[in-house]
Amino acid sequence: LKHRKLGKMEKGTMEVMYMGEKKGIGLVLAGGGGKGAYQVGVLKVLQEQGLLQDVSVISGASIGAVNAMLYSMDNMDRMYQAWDEIDMDTVFDVDLNMLAENRMYFSRNEMLAMFEKYIDMEKIKADSRDIYVSISRLNETQQPEQVEYRRLEDYDADTIRKILLASTALPVMYEAVEIDGKKYRDGGLLDNEPIQPLYDLGIRQFIVIGMRAGKVLNTDKWPDAQFITIYPSHDLGDLIDGTLNFTGRAKEFRQMLGEKDALRSLKTKFQPDDLYIRMEPVLAQNDYNDIVMQMRVNHTYKTMENRLNSNIEKFN
C-alpha cells in the first residue's frame, strides 16, 4: 500500500493509506431517489481529499446510476447545478398525451431534458472509467426476476439513455423500459448496491456510498476485498418523504449531511483515535444540529431578501 498526504480537514492533516493497486478502486453508488442528493455531498468531500483520483470503475443503481454519470463529467459544480434542477416537476412530469392513451404513468421527458443538458454521452463512452448500471429484467407477469449489469461504454447514446431510464423506473410511477425486446425496471429492486459486477472484474478495493441510515455492509460475499463505506448518520426518510422527495430544502439537507458524514468517516478510517471513535455519535448529532441551524439561518435570510426586493419593486 502506498501513502499519501491529504489536505487539511477540520484540525490538522490526515495521513492515509491509498488503496490503489493495478485495477484501481471501484466506486459504488446506491439507489434511493431524492436521497441521492446525499451522495453529491459525500462525493464532493472525497474528491477534495483525493480519494477518487484512482477510481477506475463506477457502478450505480437507480439514482446512483444518474450520479455515476453526472460525476463522470468531472465537474462537481455542474453536478450540484444538475441537482438544483432535479425537482418535483422533473420527477412528477405529467404528459397529457400519455393520459389520453390511458398510460397512467408520469412522463420521463423532463428527466431526459436534464440528461441532455448535463450528461455528454460521447464523454461517457470515451472515459477511461467504466460505468456499470444495474437494471431489473421483468418476467411475463411483469415482476422483476433477474438483475443485469450493463457497461455503458458498450452502447450507443440512445441505448445508454434507455438503460438510465430503466434503472430509474420505479414501479407504479414509471413505465417499464424496453431494451432489445425485453422489459426492465429500477435496478435497485434486485441489486441496490452493485458491488458484484466490479468484484467480478477483479476490483478488490471499494468505496460504497449508501442511503440507509446506520447500515453495516455485509461483506461476507467478498472476503478478500477492502471497503470504505459511508452511510447516512440520520434517516433520510421513507418512500414518500425520502425517495420521492426532491424539494429544495430536502436536497440541501442531504447534501450538507453527506459532506459532514464523509468528513467524520474519513477521520475515523484514516486517523483512528479511540476518543474520537467513542465520541463519533455525539459529533454526528452536533453536525446534524449545525445543519438544521444553518438551514434556518439560510431560510430566514432568503425570506428577508425576498421581502426587501419586493418592497423595492413597489417604489420603482
Residue ranges: model-predicted function:
Residues 3-59, 69-316:
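Patatin-like phospholipase
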Residues 60, 64:
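Gly/Ala-rich beta-loop-alpha elbow adjacent to hydrolase catalytic centers
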